Amino acid sequence: MRDRLAMSDREQVPDRDSSTGAVASGSVDTRRLRVALLSYRSKVHSGGQGVYIRHLSRELAALGHDVEVISGPPYPELDPGPRLTRLPSLDLYREPDPFRIPHWREFRSAIDILEFAMMCTASFPEPLTFSLRSWRVLVNRPRESWPDIVHDNQTLGYGMLLTRKAGLPVVATVHHPIAVDRRLELAAATLRKQIPIRRWYSFLRMQGRVARRLPAVLTVSQSSRADIITSFEVQADRMTVVPLGVAHDVFVPPSQPRVPGRIVATASADVPLKGLVPLLEATASLRADRPVELVVVGTVREGGATAAAIERLGLTASVRFVADLSEADLVALFQSAQVAVVPSLYEGFSLPAVEVMACATPLVATTAGALPEVVGPDGEAALHVPPGDPAALAAAIGRVLDDDGLAGRLGAAGRARVLQRYTWRVVAERTAAWYHACLAEGGVTC
């Protein structure tokens, strides 16, 4: 493998700024690589990671690389180019019967038994069990068919270290450290509920250990880079930043008028981190003097804080949750909004932010995490508000609803920012350059 990637056969590999992890421009190695792209769950509707897998795999293949996506369920929706290898699991969290008890005939291996046992103790087993399944599949192949590089998408299970020990180069993308999600959920939970939350997030210790032992880690923003260095104690010189992209030829400005008073937000999960309760309180405030409708892409958790806030604020008729939208329906929804909101208490990047900007939809976003880095300075392509501040949210949303000129300027600037910075082809080119740089440095299997 190393012979195929000898220094004498490659062009100049771009340098990396050790202080920021940014990849510098310059001539890059364009030779074809065999890439195994791993993700323990990858369906587009499961969140931003499914979107990442779909578009990165397609664009890497378009650049001429041989791309195999290895995924557990729910499986990704791939475009022509990459191929999919499905790794079946017990799929214990599938809808409509999450936390199900599988039939004994479903158990096919010791990994299945481990998966079920971990669920029974309120732990989340998928990162560990998927990593073990992928290790088993990869190392049992003939060595001549091994990929040149294994790119893990935030699984960070112990199986990744076993894969490296077998001699395969392994690197990873970490979108943001899930320790942030755990901290926010614990802060919002009662003492009784904190115990199962801690058990559920017990995989974080494993993820930190694995991340520290990988020679190269990719992330999507400078904010996430700083958080990963702090939370996972990854060495700064092992970190590289490549921002995410958007399908800018699909997410386009509308050809029809927007729906007056329609506010759109996206929440991949009904958890405190997504800031839905402050947004609901802002919506209730806005309804006092104007007709507004809030449409949230996601699902509401029965008996949770969001459902309780909707009832408490009398918003049952004014708030709508929509889930499992096709890409075309999602685009149409973003195009229909008079204003879009990202109310999160933390974001490592925020794909919805760049998707709505690509639709030239005016955006209000909090200053949490990477959001200012992604959407740009306050007032240019988006209005900034402090996280968790319903009054500030209501004021900013109201400004956009009341000022067509401001809305138009924000929308046009958002679209321009996307076209300049956030395309999937650029993401793939920079990721491929990172692969070559990692392999050239010679430390990917140490």
Which residues does each PLM region occupy?
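Carbohydrate-associated surface elements
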Residues: 223, 245
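Acceptor-binding helix/loop patch of EC 2.4 sugar-transfer enzymes
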Residues: 98-122, 164-208
